[in-house]
Amino acid sequence: MAVTAFNTLKLVSSSLDPIPSVSCSSYSFSLIYVGSPYKRCLKQSCSVRAMTSSSSAASSSSSSFGSRMEESIRKTVTENTVVIYSKTWCSYCTEVKTLFKRLGVQPLVVELDQLGPQGPQLQKVLERLTGQHTVPNVFVCGKHIGGCTDTVKLNRKGDLELMLAEANGKNGQS
């Protein structure tokens, strides 16, 4: 197992053979963190932009596969200061990861292309939650800030560092 400069989130499945539909309730999964030294975002009231489900099948059963994925995403982005949903081969993802490294921030990176069949499913749920179908999909303190272009713009304006400083200040108060 190669060690990278970024922590990754691994998805472990139980009894997932073919890729099921997102709303199938007979499948389950669990998220396992691998070395997560991040400060937790104390702002529990942070909301992720467009966090509504457009799928009536997924919202009709709270125990459905898609609903559990949505819940896991929400939990992940609110419990970690910076989360990047990425793909290892994507140059835009690399640019965003490098930007946070330059800022002295070690984000939680979820490499969707290394999650097997759950990667595309997770990306579909992210699209439903955020309206964004591309990677990187970046969250700061539970708030969806967008992709590479959005993140770079926030950094150029100085807003990204302000968001990170605010998050660190709140984490330091505990």
Swiss-Prot record:
Record PTM N-acetylthreonine, positions in chain: 52
- List, alphabetically, the GO terms of the cellular component aspect: chloroplast
User: Can you say where in the cell this protein is located?
Assistant: Plastid, Chloroplast
InterPro entries with a match to the protein in the record = Glutaredoxin (IPR002109), Glutaredoxin_euk/vir (IPR011899), Glutaredoxin_subgr (IPR014025), Thioredoxin-like_sf (IPR036249)
Key words, A-Z: Acetylation, Chloroplast, Disulfide bond, Electron transport, Glutathionylation, Plastid, Redox-active center, Transit peptide, Transport
For this protein, the record's CDD domains field holds:
GRX_GRXh_1_2_like
Effect of changing residue 93 to S: reported as: Loss of Fe-S cluster incorporation, but increased glutaredoxin activity
The record's Gene Ontology biological-process terms are: iron-sulfur cluster assembly
Q: Name one Pfam family in it.
A: Glutaredoxin
PTM summary:
Glutathionylated.
Output the Gene3D superfamilies linked to this UniProt entry.
Glutaredoxin
| Function of the molecule | Has a glutathione-disulfide oxidoreductase activity in the presence of NADPH and glutathione reductase. Reduces low molecular weight disulfides and proteins. Can assemble a [2Fe-2S] cluster, but cannot transfer it to an apoferredoxin.
NCBIfam families xrefs: GRX_euk
**Assembly with partners or alone:** Monomeric apoprotein and homodimeric holoprotein containing a [2Fe-2S] cluster. No in vitro interactions with SUFE1, BOLA1, BOLA2 or BOLA4.
State the family named in the UniProt similarity comment for this chain: Belongs to the glutaredoxin family. CPYC subfamily.
Protein name (record): Glutaredoxin-C5, chloroplastic
Please tell me the species this chain comes from: Arabidopsis thaliana
Q: What is the lineage of its organism?
A: Eukaryota, Viridiplantae, Streptophyta, Embryophyta, Tracheophyta
